[in-house]
Amino acid sequence: KDPLQAERALAEGHCDLVGIVRGQIADADFAAKARAGATDETRLCLSCNQECVGRMGLNRWLGCIENPRTGREAEGVGAIRITPKPKSVMVVGAGPGGLQAAIASRRNGHAVTVFEKESQAGGQVRIAASVPNRAEFGDMVRNQLAECRRLGVKFEYDVGVWPGLVEECRPDHVIIATGAEPAQP
């Protein structure tokens, strides 16, 4: 699942070789990052089996909920296009959608600030990660936050967004990523 786990298995003599597939689906640079010792930057597989194993036999392209480019590399999905005219971008919501919007905007050269009404990022994924045996869903947010930090995305926690704040901040663009409310059983 992660480079440290693979190294540990080798060091303890449990195996002579480690094959990692889903880890490289989640992060195409998995091996290069492991070799460079950049394990904190590695996007870890969530073990969800949704878009990789879950698509087997369905005659659909390979995908990964952690990596929107997986299976679409040739289409240019997620390709970085640095803008010659950077804009200020306000992202409202720090769930997975908001974090991914922030990452994409920042990679393309824009100045990004994420506003989150809660004291921490994650949105509904925090609920999914609390289900027994599904804690790895929290890795998605951890991975996205690590990428946001690396890129220099700014965060404002415990700040709800209202029209007055948008007028005060005067961003060039606003991305609303406030997610959904959990369904009542």
Residue map of PLM features:
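Glycine-rich, histidine-containing beta strand-loop boundary motifs that form or position
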Residues: R22, V159, T178
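Short, structured coil segments at secondary-structure junctions
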Residues: G13-H14, L151, R170
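Flavin-dependent oxidoreductase catalytic cores
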Residues: K1-V92, P96-R107, A111-V112, Q120, ...
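Short, hinge-like loop/turn segments at secondary-structure boundaries
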Residues: G13, R35-A38, S130-R134, V174
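Glycine-/small-residue-rich beta->alpha transition segments that form the dinucleotide
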Residues: P171-H173, A177-Q184
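Short amphipathic alpha-helix with an adjacent loop that forms part of the alpha/beta core around
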Residues: P163-C169
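Beta1-alpha1 glycine-rich phosphate/pyrophosphate-binding loop at the start
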Residues: V91-D158, A183-P185
